[in-house]
């Protein structure tokens, strides 16, 4: 009714949460059109969601809130590409961005004794020391020449497969764009796209984004 009346202030608190998948998809398009229509100039529309994919699809200005504290504001694309800190990176990705503690030392990124990478040239300006490295599930891939990980969970979602894996204390999630079957404790080799690697400082604040540099 508020939408029909073009109310000046619209507060939509997870309006699609109890709907089936197809109806949610259809109504997301409706709400996205609202952001792009005259309604956006006439009214203030606040859409609350705990679904990061939904927030990104609506493509408006977003406010990332955690435990009542505003962490970052801005256009959805800007926040997604340049999360201010680790918490924002985790909240705005589904599954959450993989965050790996590591050390830069002697032109290497060292996660542990069995997982070391050559420091890419675009990160050569970073000083030696402790950092957190972020990589999305979509930027990890199965690679026979990669590093060994052990499968903890294989989760099929629609036409995609999510592999939850570990190597010693490191835990990551990898997305495969097809249905694949894996068993508990399967050994797989993976690599990461170094051109999509984020770097956060010891306090968890962003210091390098692949979309804008440092």
List where the protein language model places each region.
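ABC ATPase nucleotide-binding domains
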Residues: 1-87
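Conserved coupling/switch loops of ABC nucleotide-binding domains, chiefly the family-specific signature
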Residues: 67, 101, 197
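C-terminal boundary and immediately downstream tail of ABC-type ATPase nucleotide-binding domains
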Residues: 81-105, 193
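Non-catalytic connector elements of ABC transporters
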Residues: 97, 108-214
């Amino acid at each position: 009714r508020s939408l029909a009346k073009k109310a000046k202030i619209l507060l939509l608190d997870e309006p699609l949460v109890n709907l089936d998948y197809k109806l949610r998809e259809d109504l997301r398009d409706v709400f996205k059109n609202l952001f792009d229509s005259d309604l956006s100039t006439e009214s203030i529309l606040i859409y609350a969601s705990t679904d990061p994919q939904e927030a990104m699809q609506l493509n408006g200005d977003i406010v990332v809130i955690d435990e009542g504290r505003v962490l970052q504001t801005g256009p959805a694309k800007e926040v997604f590409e340049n999360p201010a800190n680790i918490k924002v990176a985790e909240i705005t990705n589904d599954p959450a961005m993989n965050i790996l503690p590591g050390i830069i030392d002697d032109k290497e990124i060292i996660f542990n004794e069995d997982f070391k990478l050559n420091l890419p040239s675009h990160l050569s300006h970073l000083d030696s020391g402790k950092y957190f490295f972020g990589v999305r599930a979509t930027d990890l891939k199965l690679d026979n020449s990669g590093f060994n990980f052990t499968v903890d969970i294989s989760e099929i979602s629609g036409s995609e497969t999510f592999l939850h894996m570990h190597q010693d204390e490191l835990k990551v999630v990898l997305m495969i764009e097809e249905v694949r079957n894996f068993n508990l404790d399967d050994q797989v080799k993976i690599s990461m796209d170094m051109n999509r690697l984020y770097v956060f400082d010891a306090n968890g604040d962003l210091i390098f984004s692949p979309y804008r540099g440092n």
